[in-house]
């Protein structure tokens, strides 16, 4: 008997009224044979039901091919969906991959911090610990996350 072949499935949970096509297009380009299920206006309660239903039908092997992508412009609502998703994952002996990137803020901020750190190391300046870092226009989503990431590197952070 041959092993079942699982198709890659992305379950997009978006807290906004409309799910942004940006990440769905990136997913389809990276995995052309994938399937995307999108859910909009998702709350923590909704997420628990959706994720629970996505956990079990494919078993542990199929779970490796099922990704949960959490998105939205409201960080608090996204955090609620993430918490509900993580709690739901505890109910199974396996879990799905979870990707969290509210409107690209996490990936953009992480890229900026990684680039800064790489430049500092490349110039022989060492780590960011104790260095002064200014995040320009840092009150938006990307700036807020970048400031937290710089602080986690023990940099002295100023937000303008």
Identify the function of each model-found stretch.
Residues 91-99, 129:
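Glycine/charged-rich beta-loop-alpha catalytic/anionic-binding loops adjacent to active sites
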Residues 119-160:
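Glycine-rich phosphate/diphosphate-binding loop of Rossmann-like nucleotide-binding domains
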Residues 83-86, 113-121:
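Short, well-ordered amphipathic alpha-helices
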Residues 68, 99-102, 132-137:
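Extended hydrophobic secondary-structure segments that form protein cores and membrane-embedded regions
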Residues 63-65, 94-95, 151-158:
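Short, surface-exposed connector motifs at secondary-structure boundaries
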Residues 1-94:
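N-terminal ligand-binding/catalytic initiation module
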Residues 99-118:
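A glycine-rich, Thr/Ser-enriched phosphate-binding loop motif common to dinucleotide/cofactor-binding enzymes
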Residues 17, 73-78, 104-108, 138-143:
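Gly/Ser/Thr-rich loops at beta-strand to alpha-helix junctions
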């Amino acid at each position: 008997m041959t092993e079942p072949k699982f198709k890659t499935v992305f379950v997009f949970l978006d807290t906004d009224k409309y799910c942004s096509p940006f990440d769905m297009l990136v997913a389809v380009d990276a995995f052309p044979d994938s399937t995307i299920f999108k859910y909009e206006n998702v709350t923590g309660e909704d997420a628990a039901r959706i994720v629970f239903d996505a956990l079990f039908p494919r078993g542990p092997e199929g779970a490796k091919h099922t990704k949960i992508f959490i998105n939205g412009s409201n960080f608090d609502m996204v955090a609620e969906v993430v918490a509900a998703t993580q709690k739901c994952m505890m109910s199974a002996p396996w879990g799905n991959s979870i990707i969290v990137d509210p409107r690209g803020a996490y990936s953009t901020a992480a890229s900026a911090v990684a680039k800064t750190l790489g430049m500092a190391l490349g110039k022989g300046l060492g780590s960011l610990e104790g260095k002064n870092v200014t995040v320009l226009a840092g009150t938006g989503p990307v700036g807020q996350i970048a400031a937290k990431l710089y602080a986690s590197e023990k940099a002295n952070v100023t937000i303008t």
